[in-house]
């Protein structure tokens, strides 16, 4: 049967025995899903992505049966049967006579308002819902045996095979949905985590934490009806993707909540799961598995965007989602899940604003610059140097204190909302740095400091160039050099665990990659 014939058959309401009023077709990169109330039919596409192979009719039949069998574990009443699609002459029929050309999984339709993603969008997911999901998963995992074969899926060699395949499949996306720096950093973080935490992975296997689980536990696969929680569409096509650490399943849903800007729910869900499973050790793996899962989702969105039948608007939306997932993976690799304030400081002309801007683009974080805040507060043009009279007002001790107070307030607001950000300012006085660190910690944030450095000649060249250029926001020029440099107090009070000195005279791309890799290495050591 051709794709066009199958498409037309599935979209025709008369193809179904119960004669629905309409047939709504949804395509994924692996299947056709047809909503024909009160049922849903799902037909696998003849695709082969390496980790998933539906290329023959026999394989599609086998995996359709596996889908029903496996999903009945968590959603018993929804998965009904596997129905053959047959052909007699040019006519296709569900469960008819003739040659079998495809197989469809038949399911009961779930109420649209109760899908977790839909409820989350209208602000209707709360603590009680999290506890219902946790209770469902706790009972499920308790019923799943841990055999030696299943435990092997948690071995580093097997996990590395999966992540290496991810990186191989992500590589064509470099320059489109993720940068080379992000790709290299995520790969470095992943392999460094394996190397430094081998004993942790071994302990997870030995203590029975590897289960025949779900493997694809995200918002779109959870249905929260008033009387039942249904967790459906587990992975049937690859046992190694489904037989995972319980921390891996937990991390997937937590990552998806982060992606949807519900960091509060993500943190509470992880905390409840660790308590319910008596598994505090999962917390050490959470950022690692979140990073892996964000990469998988980015990869899946890229696959979806590359499908030939996808229209231009859907392709663009999938690519943007892929970018967001890959940025999220990078955030986990360099900063973990806690709201982070990355302070980019340094003397005049060291290139800190350039660093801050590029890091913000890579990480998807907002950046607040003291130079920009100063001019916005005074309603002055950003790219015009302030007049001598204006500078006399803007750079008094009181005015400087107000600028740093504004930066501190913005940092507090972001951290309290669960968001990370970048601050770009000289931070030339120890008092400013101490106050910032104290206030970030008081609201539950973490912080790191990048101090930009450059040779004196380079700093002066950059300041001189501002006099002839038009793009600088900063008012500092070459005549201000000695005054600013002499007032700068190096951050000797900050230990090297949180201070990263950076030379800015090399190629910018290489400097950014080195910063991201260094931050990732620190994140691995903190885990």
Language model segments and positions:
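Small-molecule kinase domains that catalyze NTP-dependent phosphoryl transfer to phosphate-bearing small molecules
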Residues: 465-514, 522-527
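Hydrophobic anchor at the beta1->P-loop junction of P-loop NTPases
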Residues: 344
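Hydrophobic positions on the alpha1 helix immediately C-terminal to the Walker A/P-loop
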Residues: 355
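Conserved substrate/cofactor phosphate-moiety recognition/catalytic segment
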Residues: 360-419
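Conserved NTP-binding catalytic cores of kinases and kinase-like/nucleotidyltransferase enzymes
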Residues: 1-106, 111, 225-229
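Conserved lysine of the Walker
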Residues: 352
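A glycine- and Lys/Arg-enriched "phosphate-lid" helix/loop adjacent to the NTP-binding pocket
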Residues: 386-397, 441-491
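ATP-dependent phospho-/nucleotidyl transfer catalytic cores
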Residues: 51-55, 92-97, 105-219, 223-340
